[in-house]
Amino acid sequence: MSMGIVEGAFLGLVQGLTEFLPISSSGHLAVVGTLLGSDPGAAFTAICQLGTEAAVIGYFRKDIARIIGHWARSLVGRLPRNDPDARMGWLVTLGTIPIGVLGLLFQDSIETVLRGFVVIGTTLWLFALVLGAADRFGRKERTLDQLSWKHGLLFGLAQALALIPGVSRSGGTITMGLLLGYTREAAARYSFLLAIPAVVLSGFYQLYDELSRGTTIAWVPTAVATVVAFVVGYAVIAWLMRFISTHSYTPFVVYRIAAAVVVYALVLAGALPAFQGTGGS
């Protein structure tokens, strides 16, 4: 079944709701898309994520403008590289390298084998346990002013795990932040900033790659999905930043485990294929 505007809008809603929560937007898009009759695929996911990253840019626009400005001035020697905002720009650059390199090296596996629903179900519950442990036992004392180069790279490696559907980009980086002793707010804030270059570059790369292959893209539904993802994503960011200031990540841990059970049940019922290329997708 080809994707229509209604399906595109619904998938955009799913993307906007799940991109910034540590529950895996790619996993949800794969499940919902397949149940609707067509897995949206890696290209649709990447393009749709441009909408949610536009929401990040809009929400943190003042911080981002300051970071980019100071980082650019540090490039030409007008500011020292240890200036806090210039340094944040360099840390985001460093943290983007792992996902860029690994994404290119393992692109074929990401788009085929790793999109199997047994993989998604397993990563949902497995990383739920890791997130729960990090939130429970992490010291939650450090702020972003204490972010080191080593920690910046570790955040980047955690983000690279999100290449596997079901892990969650924000879930991976937030979990790493908690394990390293950062506050919930600091971990989430850096997670959102770190995602911007990776997701934007990935979206445009996927777009170029699909066009160069002659792949037909359902442009209108994809555009609708991207706009919906932007609006919903902006609201979710605002809500999440307020929520984690007074609450733990336990609700998301419980949700991930429940979602994993549902995915396994749907696989057993034959509604979802266990592995890419099998079953009814």
UniProtKB/Swiss-Prot annotation:
Q: Which GO terms describe its molecular function?
A: undecaprenyl-diphosphatase activity
Predominant location of this chain?
A: membrane
Task: Write out the GO biological process terms.
Answer: cell wall organization; peptidoglycan biosynthetic process; regulation of cell shape; response to antibiotic
Is Acetylation a UniProt keyword of this protein? no
Q: Which GO terms describe its cellular component?
A: plasma membrane
Q: Mention any Pfam family matching this sequence.
A: BacA
Q: Which residues cross the membrane?
A: 90-110, 113-133, 147-167, 191-211, 217-237, 257-277
Q: What more is known?
A: Bacitracin is thought to be involved in the inhibition of peptidoglycan synthesis by sequestering undecaprenyl diphosphate, thereby reducing the pool of lipid carrier available.
Q: What function does this protein fulfil?
A: Catalyzes the dephosphorylation of undecaprenyl diphosphate (UPP). Confers resistance to bacitracin.
Please give the PANTHER family that the UniProt record associates with this protein.
UNDECAPRENYL-DIPHOSPHATASE
NCBIfam families in the record: PRK00281.2-1, undec_PP_bacA
Kindly provide the name given to this protein in its UniProt entry: Undecaprenyl-diphosphatase
Gene behind this protein: uppP
